[in-house]
A protein has these predicted regions:
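Catalytic cores of nucleic-acid endonucleases
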Residues: 196-251
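Conserved catalytic cores of phosphodiester-cleaving nucleases, focusing on short active-site segments
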Residues: 153, 180-182, 188-196
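Flexible loop/turn segments at secondary-structure boundaries
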Residues: 169-176, 198-201, 257-261
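Short, contiguous acidic/charged loop-to-helix segments that flank catalytic cores in large enzymes
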Residues: 136-141, 170-171, 210-222, 288
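Short conserved micro-motifs at the rims of enzyme active sites and ligand-binding pockets
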Residues: 123, 193, 203-205, 261-265
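A short acidic/basic microdomain associated with nuclease active sites
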Residues: 155-176, 180
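C-terminal catalytic or substrate-handling cores of phosphate/nucleotide-
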Residues: 230, 238-275
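Interfaces and regulatory segments of ATP-dependent nucleotide/adenylate/phosphodiester-chemistry enzymes
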Residues: 1-156, 266-360
Length: 360
């Protein structure tokens, strides 16, 4: 999402080091903390030979203990207010997502969950682009997210083809199809709406969703509405560019996984989608089919583990009440669908040019 020149320049100007510095140091630090809990002097050449970059990255991803306590308390108070004291949700906020390393007064560092360093350097890059002056970069990231999904599916399943959104409708009312149209043998089998917007923690876990999570719910509801609108256009014969399968699947793919296991929030999203759809008489009850929600991570994980038949099996079952909130890959596992991990289909050096420097 952010591996392009404008984002790279913004990141370096803001932080004093590059995105490549962050990803390389995060990988090296992850290995270090897995081998030893406390870090004083790095043992790995990747880190010890880049002391200046290491110091800058540690300064950005770490917090001293007093500051960590203060921010953690503020997060907890925010959560208590948002959930009205009902802290039952599994995915709670943590300072370790943005600052996965804690620093002692004597200068030693510890990463309580080393894997979060990798998360901070990948999906966690979002934290570096939340400023008002980065709005254009975020908009570009949203578009790049759509292109990523379009490239990801045929990269893992080469028998499929993905098309960009298309303008459809009548002369009086034109609108866009969902962001991604998936074709199998020139027939549309899946339509996908992509949502790159991230929610705040309080929005994700708020007890009063109408207040706390309205932004996130509205965004996802628009995605569901777009899918339903496409179903209606197909039924009415307005969309005729490609044949459409009778078993057409609708999906909303997010950058976050905060809908995972959360059937209550999911229900609120669908409820809001119905409210929006009620304004359009052409969208009939038959068009309002179940829509599958999944994160980009889960989409990639599922595609890496299965073939076309397995993917369609996962989508069919994910739309049922029984499997609402399940990871797509977990559905395949529960159904006993054979899984065999495929090689990563893209060139990693495009986003991690330092990869060749890692020890074999």
């Amino acid at each position: 999402m952010y591996a392009h020149e404008e984002a790279r320049k913004y990141f370096e100007a803001r932080n004093g080091f590059t995105i490549d510095d962050l990803t390389l140091m995060s990988v090296g630090l992850t290995f270090e903390f897995m081998l030893q809990p406390w870090l004083v002097a790095p043992k790995h050449d990747i880190l010890s030979s880049r002391k200046e970059a290491l110091a800058k990255v540690l300064g950005a991803v770490s917090l001293p203990i007093p500051a960590a306590r203060k921010i953690a308390l503020a997060l907890r108070n925010e959560m208590i207010a948002a959930t009205k004291g009902n802290l039952l949700t599994a995915h709670r906020p943590s300072i370790l997502r943005q600052h996965p390393v804690i620093q002692k007064a004597d200068g030693a560092y510890i990463a309580p969950i080393p894997e979060l360093l990798i998360q901070r350097a990948t999906s966690g890059l979002y934290y570096d682009f939340i400023g008002v002056d980065a709005q254009g970069i975020r908009q570009q990231a949203a578009r790049r997210f759509e292109l990523y999904v379009q490239e990801l599916i045929p990269a893992y399943l080469p028998g499929l083809q993905c098309l960009d959104e298309q303008e459809i409708g009548t002369k009086k009312r034109k609108f866009l199809s969902p962001d991604v149209l998936v074709l199998n043998d020139d027939t549309i089998t899946v339509v996908i709406e992509c949502k790159a917007t991230k929610n705040t923690f309080s929005a994700q876990f708020a007890a009063d969703l109408a207040v706390g999570a309205i932004r996130g719910i509205n965004e996802l509801a628009k995605g569901v509405f777009q899918v339903w609108r496409f179903y209606a256009a197909v039924r009415q014969g307005i969309y005729t560019e490609y044949p459409v399968a009778d078993t057409l699947h609708g999906m909303v793919v997010t950058m976050d996984d905060w809908l995972r296991l959360d059937t209550y929030v999911r229900a609120e999203v669908v409820k809001e989608a119905h409210r929006v759809a009620d304004k359009y008489s052409e969208i009939e009850p038959a068009d309002r089919r179940p829509v599958v929600f999944t994160s980009a991570h889960q989409l990639a994980e599922t595609l890496a583990l299965t073939d076309e038949q397995g993917w369609y099996t996962a989508l069919t079952n994910a739309a049922t009440e029984k499997y609402q909130g399940y990871d797509l890959s977990s559905i395949l596992e529960e159904l006993g669908v054979p899984a065999e991990r495929k090689a990563f289909p893209f060139n990693m050096e495009e986003v991690m040019p330092w990869q060749k420097e890692l020890p074999k």
